[in-house]
Amino acid sequence: MKLPIYLDYSATCPVDPRVAEKMMQCLTMDGLFGNPASRSHRFGWQAEEAVDLARNQVAELLGADPREIVFTSGATESNNLAIKGVAHFYAGKGKHIITSKTEHKAVLDTCRQLEREGYEVTYLEPMPNGLFTLEQIEGALRDDTILVSIMHVNNEIGVVQNIAAIGELCRSRKILLHVDAVQSVGKIPVDVEALKVDLLSVSAHKVYGPKGIGALFVRRKPRVRLEAQMHGGGHERGMRSGTLPTHQIVGMGEAFRIAKEEMASEGQHIMALRQRLWDGIKDIEAVYINGDLEQRVPGNLNVSFAYVEGESLIMALKDLAVSSGSACTSASLEPSYVLRALGLNDELAHSSIRFSLGRFTTEEEIDYAIKLIRDSIGRLREMSPLWEMYKDGVDLNTVEWAHH
């Protein structure tokens, strides 16, 4: 077993060796290095063929038509293209958008930008388990609502929203539905027909593919129109200009092919490991799980250890690669906005750790992690005056702290 142990698969995954192998064949003179848009020679045709195959592989995992797949530089761009693209194209119909407070920053900040442009955005608040009710969404719909954007699986707490029901509602009201499926695709079944989504963002690097490549599913029937956000040579049916990076697209295709084949067995393996981890730490005193445990993706475990500072715990767990909050915002010392939206107080939000398991996680690593967590929590709490007060029966919410 090698240290440190990687338990941060929700931040990124290592590239699967089979994917890396395929990518290597698209880079050098003796490989498929051509520009897929070069129509006048074999180098271009071969590259185009490789891109077409990958487009089919991505479409197959999503239950989509390959013509509905638009390649982008990643899910951040996919989210921007979907939300701004729809908002700008349908501005004549209305300027109201609905999303949630627990979305990824790539959705929230895109909506903030649209607010600066004169659009109105409603931010829904989740229930304490991280889920939304259909009534909440229905109650927020207006005559001028043009788009609802809700993530399938949350990146911090791993809860799975009932997208099919939301899709049904939006379809009946003729409102477009965009779904950020970065954390669900390849982990749980995602079928764009069953979910009734109009736009769906995916990324390769959360599915053991390379970073820097993603895709946006854009429905053809009923047809969804977008205003391009990147202008140039008119690639990707005019929706996203820029030379297609053959090696990255091929890598994404292979990653999605493997995911389709291995998702069921891999899900069981990861679920068993997560259960092993939770069973190993759940009897520690004052430990709380964040988000619904039933409606949850297999690899995610988000836990708050009361009376332990999250940052100091991460330092104590230096042999484990874990995070507090998401990687995208972990540089800030603010408590997780996702956990705050669930109603957690600052202290509990600050003491949360996200463990995310994946394809290459082993039982041996989980057992090592359990021992390390138990030892570290015990040691850190011994040093904590708050823990001492809690053990003495002091209700810490009633304590008046002096401000100097």
UniProtKB/Swiss-Prot annotation:
UniProt EC number: 2.8.1.7
The answer to whether keyword Cell inner membrane applies is no
Q: Where is the active site?
A: C328
Where does the record place the modification N6-(pyridoxal phosphate)lysine?
Answer: K206
Residues annotated as binding [2Fe-2S] cluster: C328
Please name the top-level EC class of this enzyme: transferase
What family is this protein classified in?
Answer: Belongs to the class-V pyridoxal-phosphate-dependent aminotransferase family. NifS/IscS subfamily.
Assembly notes: Homodimer. Forms a heterotetramer with IscU, interacts with other sulfur acceptors.
Its job: Master enzyme that delivers sulfur to a number of partners involved in Fe-S cluster assembly, tRNA modification or cofactor biosynthesis. Catalyzes the removal of elemental sulfur atoms from cysteine to produce alanine. Functions as a sulfur delivery protein for Fe-S cluster synthesis onto IscU, an Fe-S scaffold assembly protein, as well as other S acceptor proteins.
Record-given protein name: Cysteine desulfurase IscS
Which taxonomic lineage does the organism of this UniProt entry have? Bacteria, Pseudomonadati, Pseudomonadota, Gammaproteobacteria, Aeromonadales
